[in-house]
Amino acid sequence: MSIEKIWAREILDSRGNPTVEVDLYTAKGLFRAAVPSGASTGIYEALELRDGDKQRYLGKGVLKAVDHINSTIAPALISSGLSVVEQEKLDNLMLELDGTENKSKFGANAILGVSLAVCKAGAAERELPLYRHIAQLAGNSDLILPVPAFNVINGGSHAGNKLAMQEFMILPVGAESFRDAMRLGAEVYHTLKGVIKDKYGKDATNVGDEGGFAPNILENSEALELVKEAIDKAGYTEKIVIGMDVAASEFYRDGKYDLDFKSPTDPSRYITGDQLGALYQDFVRDYPVVSIEDPFDQDDWAAWSKFTANVGIQIVGDDLTVTNPKRIERAVEEKACNCLLLKVNQIGSVTEAIQACKLAQENGWGVMVSHRSGETEDTFIADLVVGLCTGQIKTGAPCRSERLAKYNQLMRIEEELGDEARFAGHNFRNPSVL
């Protein structure tokens, strides 16, 4: 079934910033997709095209990207006569039209919006749920419900507190199902709210961009202590473990790291990569930390490789790998990490996201599907994580509708699968063993 019409528009994301939404029409109806956007972005990500007109949305408008879709991409895809089930051909056509390595001509936000809409239309054309269509595109016969990694304390570039490290997450690996994992996560989240309120007052329970609490604490170990206390208090010590996203590139200064980067600059307090690695070792020893994302700067390769060789936990590459096959290949070669953070808007098309996932899995890595801090009500990544069988997803706290949209969709998928539903649980790093 070929494409009849494509129309893009500018909408607002969960942070009140403009983003791209695409409507794609076939004989089967209308298929709509919206593109997310990050706050802490890796320098190697595909280019998100912003207008730069300071008189409008402080320069963050996306009318240029929208115009590229409506004026160039739409006519080309419609006249190609390609069917919406031909995801790879349609994605490749857009990449050829763009002609740049980082999608800087049209913008990754333009290409991705169309790519996501094509994928949804392709599922309808095949009369399949989106997650089954994605599984077929990836050549997967399995379908796995992921362990959710709930971001319950926000710091770094996602919050106005002094905390340097960006996310402190809970993973209900001991839950019996995805629905059960949601309950455990929500109960710990509410318990944590009480713990924070008792210690720091009601103001401290304000939430950050991803729905996590943002108490004004400085010590990262204090955040871990709060999370551990909430898990214990809720009665889930045996069922819930902790993950972190440090986003260390955000506080990398002159070859060192500044754990108080939101205060005035003072090079005397900077620490080395080795010292930071030792701090993580303490965290792993003292708390049930099983996953650390972006522990070092995106170009501090030596620190990554050294640390990954010395710990047995999951080390996730986000800014390091930016869902880019070339960066993933280098990280595999240098043994820099052992898990890929998969963000569709870092690479900019469904086909390339699937390829990046397969590349990581073929090299024995785990894969965690991820939202961005600037999200929309679009639920594509919920279907993506099931279809790609990655076993783990992070899409914020169990709070804020743009986060719950994804989690709720996953509960619907689990219900739809019925007896066929399998939950990754303790095997979240390697769900293929299920």
Swiss-Prot record:
Sites bearing Phosphothreonine, chain numbering: 26
Chief subcellular location: cytoplasm
Tree of life domain: Eukaryota
Gene Ontology CC entries for this record: cell cortex; cell surface; cytosol; extracellular exosome; extracellular space; growth cone; membrane; membrane raft
GO molecular function per UniProt: enzyme binding; identical protein binding; magnesium ion binding; phosphopyruvate hydratase activity; protein-containing complex binding
InterPro entries recorded: Enolase (IPR000941), Enolase-like_C_sf (IPR036849), Enolase-like_N (IPR029017), Enolase_C (IPR020810), Enolase_CS (IPR020809), Enolase_N (IPR020811)
Protein name, as recorded: Gamma-enolase
Functional summary from the UniProt entry: Has neurotrophic and neuroprotective properties on a broad spectrum of central nervous system (CNS) neurons. Binds, in a calcium-dependent manner, to cultured neocortical neurons and promotes cell survival.
Binding site for Mg(2+) 2: 245, 293, 318
Modified residues (N-acetylserine): 2
Keywords of the record: Acetylation, Cell membrane, Cytoplasm, Glycolysis, Hydroxylation, Isopeptide bond, Lyase, Magnesium, Membrane, Metal-binding, Phosphoprotein, Ubl conjugation
Phosphoserine: residues carrying this PTM: 263, 291
Residues that coordinate or bind Mg(2+) 1: 40
Reactions mediated catalytically: (2R)-2-phosphoglycerate = phosphoenolpyruvate + H2O
Binding site for substrate: 158, 167, 293, 318, 370-373, 394
Reported induction: Levels of ENO2 increase dramatically in cardiovascular accidents, cerebral trauma, brain tumors and Creutzfeldt-Jakob disease. (Microbial infection) Activated by human cytomegalovirus (HCMV) UL38 in order to provide the virus with glycosyl building blocks.
Phosphotyrosine PTM positions: 44, 287
Binding site for Mg(2+): 245, 293, 318
Residue list for modification N6-(2-hydroxyisobutyryl)lysine: 233
